[in-house]
UniProtKB/Swiss-Prot annotation:
The gene is hemF. GO terms for cellular component: cytoplasm. PANTHER family: COPROPORPHYRINOGEN III OXIDASE, MITOCHONDRIAL, OXYGEN-DEPENDENT COPROPORPHYRINOGEN-III OXIDASE, MITOCHONDRIAL. Homodimer. This is Oxygen-dependent coproporphyrinogen-III oxidase. The active site is at 108 (proton donor). Substrate binds at residues 94, 110-112, 260-262. The record marks 177 as: Important for dimerization. It comes from the Bacteria. Signal peptide: none annotated. Involved in the heme biosynthesis. Catalyzes the aerobic oxidative decarboxylation of propionate groups of rings A and B of coproporphyrinogen-III to yield the vinyl groups in protoporphyrinogen-IX. Gene3D superfamilies: Coproporphyrinogen III oxidase, aerobic. One of its GO terms (molecular function) is protein homodimerization activity.
Amino acid sequence: MGLPNAEEVKAFLMQLQANICAGLERLDGQASFATDSWQRAEGGGGISRVLTDGAVFEQAGVNFSHVMGASMPASATAHRPELAGRSFEAMGVSLVIHPKNPYIPTTHANVRFFIARKEGADPVWWFGGGFDLTPYYPFESDVKEWHQSAKDLCAPFGNEVYPKYKEWCDKYFFLPHRGETRGVGGLFFDDLNHWEFDKCFDYMQAVGNGFLTAYAPIVERRKDTAYGERERDFQLYRRGRYVEFNLVYDRGTLFGLQTGGRTESILMSMPPLVRWQYAYSPEAGTPEAELYERFLKPQDWLAD
């Protein structure tokens, strides 16, 4: 069966952060990550690692956090009354990568574990996470490869896992006020505890370890593509959607800001440069128009 082992999860997460940072440094070939360790007065802390102004990545942030408290914040117990009066531990790795070249997609990934304890009662625990891709220029082969990687890592856990978490990702990363998805999706899962602990932990590890396997080939393929001012302007405009989603809809961002989380780490996902343009509409027949017409809506990318 396997009892929840928070220390084992923490060790994996810290190693995952190190592995992903090393992999991104190899891909960039120029810049390295700066490390910022921090403590939380209420308990716990984290390690924020940020790469800026690299050859490939304009900014990449990879954050590890492990926070704890004697009681759950009211915002967390509102829809989970069984957590009231329990101490808690929450830990995770989250990352957002903003490349320089507009032909490389922006990406986000996150894996996390939560456990709440109470004397004389079984612990309440769950895993969450996923990864998603936000291209600026449409390459269907990249998107298919991304989703194939996601499907492959899900396969050992059951045929229903990929379609379930792929659909959840499409629904979660959606901007209602724009009527479009933030990108082309991937995987999103939360409240994962319906398998025994060891299997749930194995799945979280598969998602965490599978992220670079899915992303690195796309970076390698696109990083030397020539681009000009037009592509850069469109990239900066589309980055605005990232800001809109994270500040208006993202549960993790809102929870962190509402519960006194570390602002610098929470807002590490923001792109370093972004632009808005009133009533922008892409010119018909352009790659920019194709992104809007074909890519920013949920679909089965692996259909024959």
